[in-house]
Amino acid sequence: MGFPKEGEKVQIHSYKHNGSIHRMWEETTILKGTQSLVIGANDRTVVTESDGRTWVTREPAICYFHANYWFNVIGMLREEGVYYYCNLSSPFAYDSEALKYIDYDLDIKVYPDMTYTLLDEDEYEKHSQIMQYPPVIDTILKRNVAHLTQWIHQRKGPFAPDFVDMWYERYLMYRN
């Protein structure tokens, strides 16, 4: 597996455990790309759902993917502050087609005051049965929910106070 290069524009593909496509983001600019970490940004990019419907993101977003963690984080810059959407997912993979991961349904929404809500537990339970997630997936995801909430409390990684603003400034250099 290679990794995307700084300044490169890539697609992001989200899959389900059974291999079906879940969602695709048309264009994300890579701000940092290594074997273990990818940071990207997009703004008003087209998103295609599995049923073919499309929509456009409303605000600039900084995307954080790590090869050692079972989650990715999207920091969305809004007037009221930075909101985060955290997807519990497989670590990312990258090939010539796109940056890819498997979405495992659970999400954490983090508000500008750093309070958060765990979302879609019912969807996770349903898909766990339908797609027959192995027990090890449940163990890994629970461990990563704990890890992610610890990062939120500690304002670590993508939740650090200046993280999103710093990477957004870098993104603006590529847009001009």
Curated annotation (Swiss-Prot):
The organism of origin for this protein: Bacillus mycoides (strain KBAB4)
Query: Gene3D superfamilies, from UniProt?
Result: FomD-like
EC numbers, comma separated: 3.6.1.15, 3.6.1.6
**What's one GO MF term for it?**
ribonucleoside triphosphate phosphatase activity
Q: Which SUPFAM superfamilies match?
A: FomD-like (SSF159234)
Q: Binding of Mg(2+) 1: at which residues?
A: 87, 103, 107
- Cleaved signal peptide residues: none
Q: Extract the NCBIfam families matched here.
A: PRK13662.1 (NF010183)
Which family is this sequence assigned to? Belongs to the Ntdp family.
Under the heading PANTHER family, the entry gives: PTHR39159, UPF0374 PROTEIN YGAC
Keywords in alphabetical order, please: Hydrolase, Magnesium, Metal-binding
Q: What is this protein called?
A: Nucleoside triphosphate/diphosphate phosphatase
Superkingdom: Bacteria
Q: Which residues form the active site?
A: 23
